[in-house]
Amino acid sequence: KEELGKSLTIAAIVLMVNSFGMVVGNLLGGSLFDKLGGYRTIMIGTVTCLISTTLLNFFHGWPWYAIWLVLLGFGGGMIVPAIYAMAGAVWPNGGRQTFNAIYLAQNIGVALGAALGGFVAEFSFNYIFMANLIMYVLFAIVAITQFNLEINAKFKPQDSIDLKSKENKKRFTAMMLVCAMFAICWIAYIQWETTIASFTQSINISMSQYSVLWTVNGIMILVAQPLIRPVIRLLKGNLKYQMFVGILIFMLSFFVTSFAEQFTVFLIGMIILTFGEMFVWPAVPAIAHKLAPTGKEGAYQGYVNSASTIGKAIGPVFGGVIVDTFNMQIMFLAMMALLFIALGFVYLFGKADAKYVKND
């Protein structure tokens, strides 16, 4: 708003279109992985991102900023499912650990990116574009030198994959149920970045205090892994039960936070929320990897990544409408109700076909 002189409504529309670009990128990237392999798919996405970030450095006024942002979302969307599918191919027996490693790496990247972004923006907002380009150049170097691997993955030609077989239909149905659950979880989770963020400011909790919540979130994800391992062992590595536990913890977080009027209660709510995501977020791509028929590993990772992107896009609008129409208390209740529905999807997933993913 400050840099481009556009309304918050226009900003919201641009972000929605950016999310749409990411969804298309997720689905295309997953499909290309199955046809071209991980290295080529990642390079196509990386080149797309390099083009968009380069153009952003020279043309970042209106409407060029919005156009390049959507292109960047599309390119980045292609890369993510390919990386997940490649990780599954490189470490096929890693199960949850494979995707938990990516989850931890993503968290480190988000934390460092936010910190460095704030530091760079102190000098000039324009430097953000240059920093972004430098990061993609570094990523391209890593991709070119490290990702061109001979992966022992069993790819099948697309016309040899019988998608209409009874078994594959069951797998696809189970995958769609997990995607519905994942999207709902993200609709709820994203409220912490939108409606809850606005609510904290309205009750005189400072931005610095609010940022502490996410600092705690990031630190916990890295250091609290040993705390959830006994629970995972108790669940015998059952991914369905891990999702059940995680969603119940999400619901508890929203219940506790619904009473919050002081920073300490928000902090407790965030700590509870973080434990929930540590169960759910790595379990979903692990399920996608195990459900995917041979030759569709990329497509299934594309499905789950697009589901999370859709949840992130819908969540702010959905939560904002509820708060504007009713109040924050109704929003908290609505999120708990949605998460209860998500539990239903996990239950149906178990009924549909969980034989491929029972133990990790």
What are these regions (language model features)?
Residues I102-I144:
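Helix-loop-helix hairpin linking two adjacent transmembrane segments in secondary transporters
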Residues V70-Q106:
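Cytoplasmic helix-loop-helix junction between adjacent transmembrane helices
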Residues K1-T9, T194-Y210:
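Short amphipathic helix-loop junctions that connect adjacent transmembrane helices
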Residues N148-C179:
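Juxtamembrane intracellular "pre-TM" segments in multi-pass secondary transporters
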Residues I128-T145, F332-L348:
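Symmetry-related core transmembrane helices of the 12-TM Major Facilitator Superfamily/SLC fold
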Residues G25-G37, A224-G237:
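Helix-to-loop junctions at the C-terminal end of transmembrane segments
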Residues S52, P63-L71, T264-I272:
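Paired small-residue
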